[in-house]
Design a protein with these regions (language model features):
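Catalytic Walker B motif of ABC-type/P-loop ATPase nucleotide-binding domains
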Residues: 168-171
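Conserved ABC ATPase signature
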Residues: 143-147, 151
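A short, proline-enriched helix->beta-strand linker immediately N-terminal to the Walker B motif
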Residues: 162-166
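H-loop/switch region of ABC-family ATPase nucleotide-binding domains
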Residues: 203-204
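Conserved ABC ATPase "signature" region
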Residues: 110, 121-139
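ABC ATPase nucleotide-binding domains
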Residues: 239-282
């Protein structure tokens, strides 16, 4: 499979910071995959997301080493405008993504297209398509600042998708939503991934990570502490040392193993857990 993200020995320290936020981070992401980044607060996840879309080094200034490549482009020598054709970021707080110059949701969705010479007709067509995808057709004439948090999150995701990126980076973009709103946004993201978009997602919901991820990377104190399939990462006892709350059915499987039940592998999905427990109790 083609590697669309390649991070090699990347370190970064913000200007005037007293410590290095990212330390010799290396990993790659395959085209069309669902790649999840997990870790405790302060482990460097958001900084890494900023590096993947070019906000580091072009917006956040500091000292760096190593390289970050998106497709064939070196982030350090590419402009953010050029990178936005390939990779888009959705922030944890959707209000941080608003332009604050757009008077309507339609203008907010179209804001990024203005840097790429898109015709008015094409712009209207793209806005209509993204609004339908995000189920916000009825909000196009509304002021973004008057919307609910869940509605603004849809607008933020839509304003990223309108650029038609091949790679979507999500920095805990459902953290401020209620459970229903969170699942609605996640369902959209999952469908986009099934259609071929590469997804890099920071998330604290380990059951959701176990359910959807092709690869899971654990961050701790600015370093990569584990990298593998959900089965590999959640079955490793070392994972919990980095503030990861592993899924309950993994804990249950481990408890059954400790109690003497013959479970060759730990379950990382609920259906696996039910099947294994039934077999163990026969």
């Amino acid at each position: 499979m083609t590697k669309v993200i390649r991070v090699e020995d990347f370190s970064f320290r913000y200007r005037d910071a007293d410590r290095t936020t990212l330390k010799r981070v290396s990993f790659s992401v395959e085209q069309g995959s669902f790649f999840c980044i997990v870790g405790a607060n302060g482990s460097g996840k958001s900084t890494l997301c900023n590096a993947l879309v070019g906000l580091i080094p072009h917006y956040f200034v500091g000292k760096s080493r190593g390289s970050v490549r998106i497709k064939d482009s070196d982030v350090a020598t590419s402009t953010i405008a050029d990178l936005s054709r390939h990779v888009g970021l959705v922030f944890q707080n959707p209000f941080n993504q608003l332009s604050y110059t757009a008077g309507t949701v339609a203008e907010e969705l179209a804001f990024g297209l203005g840097n790429h010479g898109v015709s008015r007709e094409t712009m209207h067509a793209k806005v209509a398509r993204v609004a339908a995808l995000m189920h916000i057709e009825g909000l196009l004439d509304k002021n973004p600042l008057e919307l609910s948090g869940g509605q603004v999150q849809r607008v933020a995701l839509g304003s990223t998708l309108i650029m038609e990126p091949d790679i979507l980076v999500l920095d805990e973009c459902t953290a401020q939503l209620d459970p229903l709103g969170s699942e609605e946004i996640f369902d959209i993201v999952k469908r986009l991934n099934q259609e071929g978009i590469t997804v890099v997602m920071v998330d604290h919901d380990m059951e959701r990570v176990a359910r959807c991820a092709d690869q899971v990377m654990v961050m701790g104190a600015g370093r990569v502490r584990a990298l593998g399939t959900p089965e590999e990462v959640f079955a490793d006892p070392e994972t919990v040392k980095w503030g990861i709350d592993i899924p309950d059915y993994v804990k249950l499987g481990r408890g059954l193993q400790d109690a003497g039940f013959d479970l060759p592998d730990l379950p990382v999905r609920e259906d696996q857990a039910v099947r294994m427990i039934r077999e163990a109790l026969r």
